[in-house]
Amino acid sequence: MNQSLLAPFGTAIERVEAGLNALRQGQGVLVVDDEDRENEGDLIFAAQTLTNTQMAMLIRECSGIVCLCLPDEKVKALELPPMVENNSSQYGTAFTVSIEAKVGVTTGVSAADRVTTIKAAIADGAKPSDLARPGHVYPLRAQPGGVLTRRGHTEGTIDLMQLAGLKPAGVLCEVTNPDGTMARLPEIIAFGAQHNIPVLTIEDIVLYRKSLLANVG
């Protein structure tokens, strides 16, 4: 990762702290993964504070494939099976079947309907029967251990929510350029500056978590 481009955002620890503060305030963060991996940036919001306006931004400014990151135990509680039996995607992204709230939605595709679906899925005591399958929201199952186990946006999202003291569920979508191509680090930094959204990396989250473990040790 070209850390020099990220220098204006502070050190790795400072970038994570800025991201956690934004999430606690109900705002979003931009997280970029490794250059030798997807080399993409995702706009991420906490599921519990997600608004219709934020969902509209995910649909308008990003790829439109809005995903709900959930920990393994939540996926099991909602009885969400994998989207496919044999996952052959390059990075093993753990999509489950897509979902829709059974109550409170129309077609399910509008920003408001997708927020309703997400709130239904993350509700305390949510049951499998609360959700229809398929739908317009795409859950992703995070691996236990977070970014120390798998350096993906899914795990990074759950780690950030837990570090921020929020419910372990987050919503993400890949940032795209106006021409439909994937945004890379320079474009993501510009996007963050335009919308006043902090930028950090998966590597930053790894370093932050390792520093916490070192302090505990």
UniProtKB/Swiss-Prot annotation:
Keywords noted in UniProt: Lyase, Magnesium, Manganese, Metal-binding, Riboflavin biosynthesis
GO biological process: riboflavin biosynthetic process
Cofactor(s) the protein needs: Mg(2+); Mn(2+)
Cofactor binding note of this UniProt entry: Binds 2 divalent metal cations per subunit. Magnesium or manganese.
Binding site for Mg(2+) 2: 38, 153
Residues that coordinate or bind Mg(2+) 1: 38
Matches recorded under InterPro entries: DHBP_synth_RibB-like_a/b_dom, DHBP_synthase_RibB
Top EC group: lyase
Tagged with keyword Magnesium: yes
Catalytic activity line of the entry: D-ribulose 5-phosphate = (2S)-2-hydroxy-3-oxobutyl phosphate + formate + H(+)
One cellular-component annotation, GO: cytosol
Quaternary structure (record): Homodimer.
Family indicated by similarity: Belongs to the DHBP synthase family.
The protein's name in its UniProt record: 3,4-dihydroxy-2-butanone 4-phosphate synthase
